[in-house]
């Protein structure tokens, strides 16, 4: 599997940059992770390998993720069967040669909210908690020079490799690592994204400091997370679950989040978007059949979760490393 991660191409791409030394260490680090494995990894990887060959597809990444080619119904059926072997699909949507992967999240809606506020042309980007790589492809569509994503989830890696199978030359890499697996003081990326990660961290300030370590001086952080209404002293800590999630720790107000960014050493922190998450944006589909946001909200009051807490509201902030 490791050869399909194209780590040699990543090393060539980063040659001469501050990230080259790190890139040379990745094969050994990731080989060790693959040795640890996962009980379903062989099944997921088999699904990727069953994807049919499609020469020279046409690609649209600027407006959506879409791959096109001349093909017959048999190829499309083979494509759908293989992609269904990678269910559940959380982030998307994807159009694989006419097979519409209707994911749990309408991640394209989030990208429409975030992308107008970020200049990616010619930038070297790190996407922390990149999931299946949907945003990585959209970042390339917005002009990024290259995008490295890190996420330790093996299913997400296989979903990324399903897309990479048809886009082998594009400068996007998915590493099955957590942010904590990256070296300290990496300081090699122009832009770092952390979207939908901060509220899962027991120590949010440490997360912000680790993100800053990945940035060049003058680089930009794009931070998207759950927030609540309130002033700079307002932070919600759920007693147990939040929207049925056990691993949610801190939901700050926007003002508190701006304060956290300043305390972590960022400058020019500003909020560029605040949006309530709708049941149209996150829901169960044919490609993600488990419960989703409609089941996590109070059926009598959609402004509250089933635990009686404020319904999900997400903010995007951008800040600069001085």
Swiss-Prot record:
Keywords: Transferase, tRNA processing. Carboxy-S-adenosyl-L-methionine binds at residues 91, 105, 110, 129, 179-180, 195, 199, 314. CDD domains: AdoMet_MTases. InterPro entries: CmoB (IPR010017), Mo5U34_MeTrfas-like (IPR027555), SAM-dependent_MTases_sf (IPR029063). It catalyses: carboxy-S-adenosyl-L-methionine + 5-hydroxyuridine(34) in tRNA = 5-carboxymethoxyuridine(34) in tRNA + S-adenosyl-L-homocysteine + H(+). Transmembrane segments: none annotated. One of its GO terms (molecular function) is methyltransferase activity. It is an enzyme of class 2 (transferase). Gene3D superfamilies: Vaccinia Virus protein VP39. Its EC number is 2.5.1.-. It holds the Pfam family Methyltransf_9. GO terms for biological process: tRNA wobble uridine modification. HAMAP family: tRNA_carboxymethyltr_CmoB. Catalyzes carboxymethyl transfer from carboxy-S-adenosyl-L-methionine (Cx-SAM) to 5-hydroxyuridine (ho5U) to form 5-carboxymethoxyuridine (cmo5U) at position 34 in tRNAs. Belongs to the class I-like SAM-binding methyltransferase superfamily. CmoB family. Homotetramer. This is tRNA U34 carboxymethyltransferase.
């Amino acid at each position: 599997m490791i050869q399909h991660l194209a780590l040699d191409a990543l090393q060539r791409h980063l040659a001469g940059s501050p990230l080259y030394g790190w890139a040379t260490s990745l094969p050994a680090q990731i080989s060790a992770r693959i040795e640890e494995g996962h009980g379903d990894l062989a099944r997921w990887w088999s699904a990727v390998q069953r994807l049919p060959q499609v020469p020279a597809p046409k690609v649209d990444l600027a407006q959506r993720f879409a791959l096109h080619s001349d093909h017959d119904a048999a190829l499309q059926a083979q494509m759908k069967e293989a992609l269904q072997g990678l269910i559940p699909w959380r982030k998307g949507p994807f159009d694989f040669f006419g097979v519409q992967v209707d994911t749990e999240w309408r991640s394209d809606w989030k990208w429409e909210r975030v992308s107008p506020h970020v200049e990616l042309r010619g930038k070297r980007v790190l996407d922390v908690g990149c999931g299946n790589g949907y945003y990585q492809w959209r970042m390339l569509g917005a002009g990024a020079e290259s995008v490295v994503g890190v996420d330790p989830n093996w299913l997400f890696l296989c979903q990324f490799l399903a897309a990479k199978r048809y886009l082998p030359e594009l400068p996007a890499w998915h590493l099955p690592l957590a942010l904590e697996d990256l070296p300290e003081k990496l300081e090699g990326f122009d832009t770092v994204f952390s979207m939908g990660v901060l509220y899962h961290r027991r120590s949010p300030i440490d997360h912000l400091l680790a993100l800053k370590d990945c940035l060049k001086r003058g680089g930009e952080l794009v931070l998207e997370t759950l927030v609540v209404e309130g002033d700079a002293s307002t932070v919600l800590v759920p007693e147990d679950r939040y929207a049925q999630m056990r691993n949610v720790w801190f939901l700050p107000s926007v003002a508190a989040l701006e304060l956290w960014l300043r305390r972590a050493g960022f400058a020019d922190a500003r909020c560029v978007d605040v949006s309530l998450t709708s049941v149209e944006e996150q829901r169960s589909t044919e490609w993600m059949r488990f419960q989703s946001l409609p089941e996590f909200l109070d059926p009598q009051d959609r402004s509250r979760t089933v635990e009686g807490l404020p319904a999900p509201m997400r903010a995007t902030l951008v800040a600069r490393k001085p």
